[in-house]
């Protein structure tokens, strides 16, 4: 039964025309937006041809959005921060798209795509759209088609695009070339993270925020802020 259902969904996606995808995205049909993103992620030659045609039609649309990249080491609380930030934005009548990039296993090729489960409130918000995607081996903290996915979300009317990176640290600089503002979340007690900082991701961040800076971690967070200020000569 499941196999037949998946086959039907696949056939249905293949039957959609370029106009179907374009109209669906422009009307902010979330199901068609999700299918369009899946289309551009596909490596199938036929899908790629359709995806290119869809993107060419959507690129001519006026795009008036703010793109914000959010990075940080694993465990820093990116997803929790994004949910709180996203809810604040939607409360101000912004439409927020979250592109959450998850790492892909080098052994199995699989990805958990679990970021959305940590944004349960935001995922139910009618003014928010969350799309988890695997890196599929792409370096730089983003996926192979992150730029194209941003274009689709902008065409759908989302005026704030939040790009959450994989969270592997200093190598995630590609996202900085795709966004208007680049935020690096750091943990209290910077320690070894200051090593090699001049060539690292913190050097190109527009803002550094020390997260989890409450309770017993407040003093450590204050020390971390001072260390970053001295290291970066702010």
Please annotate each region the language model reported:
Residues 6-13, 216-234:
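C-terminal accessory "lid"/substrate-recognition subdomains
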Residues 68-70:
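Hydrophobic anchor at the beta1->P-loop junction of P-loop NTPases
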Residues 81:
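Hydrophobic positions on the alpha1 helix immediately C-terminal to the Walker A/P-loop
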Residues 2-25:
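Long, basic/Gly/Ser/Thr-rich N-terminal segments
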Residues 182-186, 204-214, 227-234:
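Conserved beta-strand/loop subsegment of P-loop NTPase cores
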Residues 73:
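P-loop (Walker A) phosphate-binding loop of NTP-binding proteins
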Residues 19-28, 34-66, 76, 85-171, ...:
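Nucleotide-state-sensitive switch-loop elements of NTP-binding domains
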